[in-house]
Design a protein with these regions (language model features):
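Non-catalytic accessory segments adjacent to catalytic cores
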Residues: 20-118, 160, 174, 182-186, ...
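A glycine-rich phosphate-binding loop feature that marks nucleotide/adenosyl-phosphate handling sites
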Residues: 142-145, 211-219, 275-279
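An anion-binding catalytic pocket shared by soluble metabolic enzymes
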Residues: 8-17, 21-23, 40, 110-190, ...
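A residue-level signal for conserved active-site and pocket-lining positions in enzyme catalytic cores
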Residues: 46, 100-101, 156, 257, ...
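A short glycine-rich, hydrophobically flanked beta-strand micro-motif that places a catalytic Asp/Glu
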Residues: 46, 106, 136-139, 270-277
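Conserved hydrophobic core element of enzyme catalytic domains
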Residues: 230-336
Length: 336
């Protein structure tokens, strides 16, 4: 646990910082830089909020050297949980819209709130131990506030022209056997087709796909793993920005789905549904960016806002979608 204690130290000193554990790895990467965050994708820990218009920021690699900054954090914190009546009403409106537009999809989310007495060190260590195949991350900047999570969804792993990503969608209880529903299959197909189109448009070569399932805490998802070789004149960072947010986090068509999300969710998502991860790490040797998912934001009073969502389709039922968000939220609730 000692290797994680820098998280609490940096938090209470008011520093920008990050910590992350790559799935299947024992090493934890972390940094409390003496420099402020950098705008754009640079060498360091990259953070992109959900809003496509929001700017990417990077926490550079490095150590703090004793500097204390006490930055003022972004105060857009959702203090109140999404009421079930509100969720049911607005999910119902979206589902009715989708029944008239069956080729579309909207990812609708809600917030659960609680307080915790646990330290970041305790939460991070428990997430690493409980979810060994998740991407466990924690970061804080004045622009974003403090976030921590255990994501099951890779957005992009790349080194030079080698590129990997996944389509992850569809949800059912991990303990449940049987076949996947048509709704789940169609939901996942929308995401996979979206990724195929981006790779095809970029004229990527040697595209390989592998279908399967991925367990993430109490639930499991359909997954298609993609690997490809990008042309010499195509940057992996460009593909990342085209992918995010994928239909797994926004819906389809992307901008129309985002308009529905803004209209019907009672808060701003902030970093939930965006991405974060290490870029050009000198030891790891490659870049590894993950979707900010199964995550929560923590304010200075240790109030937690847990974000949980699911894909709405024409044949969705609002009550079942509500229960799905409950199951997904247990990833974090179980460690608090």
């Amino acid at each position: 646990m000692a290797e994680y204690r820098f998280l609490d130290d940096a938090r209470w000193r008011g520093l920008c910082f990050f910590g992350c554990r790559i799935p299947g790895e024992k090493m934890v990467f972390g940094s409390c830089p003496s420099r402020d965050c950098i705008e754009g994708i640079a060498d360091g820990f990259v953070i992109k909020p959900f809003d496509p218009q929001a700017r990417v920021i990077t926490i550079p690699f490095g150590e703090a050297e004793g500097k204390e900054t006490y930055h003022e954090e972004n105060t857009d914190f959702p203090y109140y949980p999404t009421a079930k009546a509100f969720y049911m009403k607005h999910a119902g409106i979206i589902i009715d819209y989708l029944r008239e537009n069956p080729e579309k999809k909207v990812v609708y989310s809600r917030v659960l709130t609680c307080e915790t007495r646990k330290s970041l060190t305790d939460i991070f260590e428990t997430l690493c131990r409980t979810y060994p195949m998740a991407y466990v991350f924690c970061f804080r900047t004045p622009q974003t506030g403090l976030w921590i999570g255990a994501s099951p969804e890779l957005l992009g792993e790349f080194s030079k022209q080698s590129f990997k990503t996944v389509a992850l969608a569809g949800t059912m209880l991990a303990a449940r056997g049987g076949k996947w529903s048509d709704k789940n299959k169609r939901e996942q197909k929308i995401v996979a087709d979206y990724i195929r189109n981006i790779l095809s448009t970029a004229e990527a070569k040697h595209i390989y796909e592998k279908d399967g399932e991925k367990i993430a805490g109490p639930v499991k998802h359909l997954i298609t793993e993609f690997s490809a070789t990008l042309p010499d004149d195509v940057k992996a960072e460009t593909i990342i920005e085209q992918l995010s947010p994928t239909p797994a986090l926004s819906g389809y068509p992307q901008y129309e789905a985002i308009e529905m999300i803004v209209e019907h969710e009672a808060y701003r998502r902030g970093c939930y549904g965006g991405f974060c991860g290490i870029h050009n790490h000198p030891v790891y040797g490659k870049s590894c960016l993950w979707v900010n998912l199964r995550s929560m934001r923590i304010n200075a009073s240790n109030q937690c806002a847990i974000y949980s969502g699911g894909g709405l389709m024409p044949d969705s039922e609002a009550e079942e979608e509500w229960l799905e968000t409950e199951r997904k939220a247990t990833t974090l609730l179980s460690v608090l």
